[in-house]
């Protein structure tokens, strides 16, 4: 009972922060890739790639909840963490902007499959309530932030643990590289959709990556440090085990 109360308190804190982001006036920069920015063929292609990931995520989510119903509150906490961090925007490139992703914690606790669902829910609410991203571009944003970024973070986490690195170092690398991988994919998405007239898609991807890096590298480092702090608090309060879930 005490454990569930702690989780509910943490989740309510995340919800309060999310509501604050909704009521505080914000400048109208689009979060992620904004609605209507991608050509229809690319928007559809990314949606077709994202749908099987959603199906797999639902299977994983159902299995986790069936095995331990108390995980629902921890899942809500991870979802709130993703929502709050990914709603902090730093304008970077026309049609998109830099921000933390917040997926590292959920990746460590539940694996990348569940993050596809959490990320999709977050992106949907941000598109509908905050005008961040969009419905037509949700497939592209979901593939970058909720699928490929988390998969990279998960692989880094597993390799770091097998290499015997300190737990805090492994958490930091997972969160930071999941963030950077997200923006690498976003750069590719924008680059192939809008190739450079002279250098082609490759040149366009490099340009997008170069501009994103100016803000995203320090943001990713900060996200890694914050995730370490949150993970450390969850373990100290015995909300999770040291090994994660």
UniProtKB/Swiss-Prot annotation:
- List UniProt keywords, sorted A-Z: Cell inner membrane, Cell membrane, Cobalamin biosynthesis, Cobalt, Cobalt transport, Ion transport, Membrane, Signal, Transmembrane, Transmembrane helix, Transport
Q: Which organism is it from?
A: Salmonella typhimurium (strain LT2 / SGSC1412 / ATCC 700720)
Pathway the protein takes part in: Cofactor biosynthesis; adenosylcobalamin biosynthesis
Q: Which InterPro entries match?
A: CbiM, CbiM/NikMN
Identify this protein by name: Cobalt transport protein CbiM
Q: Which residues form the signal peptide?
A: 1-30
Per the UniProt record, one Pfam family is: CbiM
Provide the Gene Ontology terms for cellular component: ATP-binding cassette (ABC) transporter complex
Primary site of residence: membrane
Quote the subcellular location field of this record: Cell inner membrane
């Amino acid at each position: 009972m005490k454990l569930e109360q702690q989780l509910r308190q943490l989740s309510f804190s995340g919800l309060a922060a999310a509501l604050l982001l909704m009521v505080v006036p914000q400048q109208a920069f689009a979060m992620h890739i904004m609605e209507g920015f991608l050509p229809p063929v690319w928007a559809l292609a990314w949606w077709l790639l994202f749908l099987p990931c959603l199906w797999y995520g639902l299977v994983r989510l159902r299995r986790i909840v069936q095995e331990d119903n108390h995980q629902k509150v921890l899942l809500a906490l991870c979802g709130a963490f993703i929502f709050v961090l990914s709603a902090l925007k730093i304008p970077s490139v026309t049609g998109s902007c830099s921000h933390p992703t917040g997926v590292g914690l959920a990746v460590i606790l539940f694996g990348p499959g569940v993050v596809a669902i959490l990320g999709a829910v977050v992106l949907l609410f941000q598109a509908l309530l905050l005008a961040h991203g969009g419905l037509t571009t949700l497939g592209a944003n979901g593939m970058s932030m909720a699928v490929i970024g988390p998969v990279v973070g998960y692989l880094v986490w597993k390799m770091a643990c097998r290499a015997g690195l300190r737990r805090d170092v492994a958490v930091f690398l997972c969160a930071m590289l999941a963030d950077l991988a997200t923006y690498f994919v976003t750069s590719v998405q924008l680059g192939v959709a809008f190739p450079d007239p002279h250098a082609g898609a490759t040149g366009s991807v490099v340009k997008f990556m170069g501009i994103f890096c100016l803000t995203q590298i320090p943001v990713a480092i900060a996200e890694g440090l914050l995730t370490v702090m949150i993970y450390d608090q969850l373990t100290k309060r015995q909300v999770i085990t040291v090994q994660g879930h």
